[in-house]
Amino acid sequence: MALTIPRSQYVATYGPTVGDKVRLGDTDLWATIEQDFLTKGDECKFGGGKSVRDGMAQSSTATRDNPNVLDFALTNVMIIDAKLGIIKADIGIRDGRIVGIGQAGNPDTMDNVTPNMIIGASTEVHNGAHLIATAGGIDTHIHWICPQQAQHAIENGITTMIGGGSGPADGTHATTCTPGKFNIERMFQACEALPVNIGFFGKGNCSMLEPLKEQVVAGALGLKIHEDWGATPAVIDAALKVADEMDVQVAIHTDTLNESGFLEDTMKAINGRVIHTFHTEGAGGGHAPDIIKAAMYPNVLPASTNPNRPFTVNTIDEHLDMLMVCHHLDKRVPEDVAFADSRIRPETIAAEDILHDMGVFSIMSSDSQAMGRVGEVVTRTWQTADKMKAQRGALGDEGNDNFRIKRYIAKYTINPAIAHGISQYVGSLEVGKLADIVLWKPQFFGVKPEFVMKKGFISFAKMGDPNASIPTPQPVFYRPMFGANAKANTESAVYFVSQASVDANIKAQYGIQKETLAVKGCRDVGKKDLVHNNATPEITVDTERYEVRVDGEHITCEPATKVPLAQRYFLF
């Protein structure tokens, strides 16, 4: 006999279902659940008097020898994912990977249990009702200046960090390159204790091929070209030749001063080959004043860095000071001041907001400690989305913001994964991928996760006083959990590397414990493959007034005077 309960009671017990709207933090973004995979009346819920008990939603007979038995079941959770959409489901995890999105439980007593999502005595369970699950974020613009960045990143929901450097040397302060085998090997060894997936860029600034190839063989997952090392056409061509041969990506910070050519010369050197452009607006560096035009090309995978996301009344002043420090400039030298002024343009920064909202800019990243904040990638993304809704209105959805939400979450999850050949491993909550999962209370979405899982094991979490009688008493702050400790840490995170380095067995050479996974398909992608962010309109820039036009229409917006996800959530 069926029991009918009020919708409010159902939501209070099992969380929202199809048609229910959930506000994201204190933004004006509202997510509506599009599909619910759960069978009403057979929901799995753990606790006193609840259903996940022996012989009820937990099988009495299934052992872990049965490959359909889960290690971890995250039940009744709302999922926001660029590929899966905005849905309600149980998430099943086994051997560190997502094995099912559907209905978990006991097939002996329940209908419609997804075949490989059996809850048994071997299964840990967490109630996901009233929580939002997202894929772990991916930051592709890391200056490895200090190892402490990893903790700040994971506390904002970033689980994969790609970049370069070797500590607080001048070369690392300015560029995201780990140059040469010695430095690459030491960085792999140094990062064994960090709780995130990691990939390193080799230094791509060399006009000859062999010095580039040896870095890829040493473990670089890609090459980074930076103007401070000389972003010349010869360097660009050489790096791309090696990338095409060895199936790795090239990232580029182009020539702000136009010393060796203009944007057109750089695009000619790229010659239609795929490339990932960093801070494509130009405040972080790049051909002044029109690097933003690179975003219109089908072979360019354009990214932003977060310090000018979104455009606010404080953006310009802050950037001038940051730039002087990061690129070793002197306010007493007129040429250095002119260099800084050429990069910081309110007109193109304003246009960048709109290009993100149009799906022209595809990726969000940090530029950590080098004109960017490693712990704010997720937050700045949603602040930009909220600002654009306020200034541009809805993006076609009726009564919700689902399309805009999926467009923006793709910018720091699936799209950077596609750009760097790791989308078969991370970037979404699709079945088969690593169980790198971030859980949020809706009111803290985009700011402070409840906890972060790495390969199906809890790595970081908000945690109260360890000496208290329950987990919640203050002071509550982020602490490393068992997944970030000792050998569990090396089992819960991976290194992304080139196939050539896997073939060379760098894991044994360097004596590292983390799994090494090869990047794949880096040279076969284009902007058309980027999810919800693949627009290629014609972009022009007035070189005197810096006005940006898209298909002939001038685009601009006002700087924000207030943003969400800000002081309401932080003491400082």
Curated annotation (Swiss-Prot):
Binds 2 nickel ions per subunit. Pfam families: Amidohydro_1, Urease_alpha. Its cofactor is Ni cation. Carboxylation allows a single lysine to coordinate two nickel ions. It catalyses: urea + 2 H2O + H(+) = hydrogencarbonate + 2 NH4(+). Residues 136-572 form the Urease domain. The active site is at 327 (proton donor). It is an enzyme of class 3 (hydrolase). It is found in: Cytoplasm. InterPro entries: Amidohydro-rel, Metal-dep_hydrolase_composite, Metal_Hydrolase, Urease_alpha_N_dom, Urease_alpha_subunit, Urease_AS, Urease_asu, Urease_asu_c. Coiled coil: none annotated. Ni(2+) 2 binds at residues 224, 253, 279. GO terms for biological process: urea catabolic process. GO terms for molecular function: nickel cation binding; urease activity. The keyword Cytoplasm applies. Keywords: Cytoplasm, Hydrolase, Metal-binding, Nickel. Belongs to the metallo-dependent hydrolases superfamily. Urease alpha subunit family. This is Urease subunit alpha. It comes from Actinobacillus pleuropneumoniae (Haemophilus pleuropneumoniae). The gene is ureC.
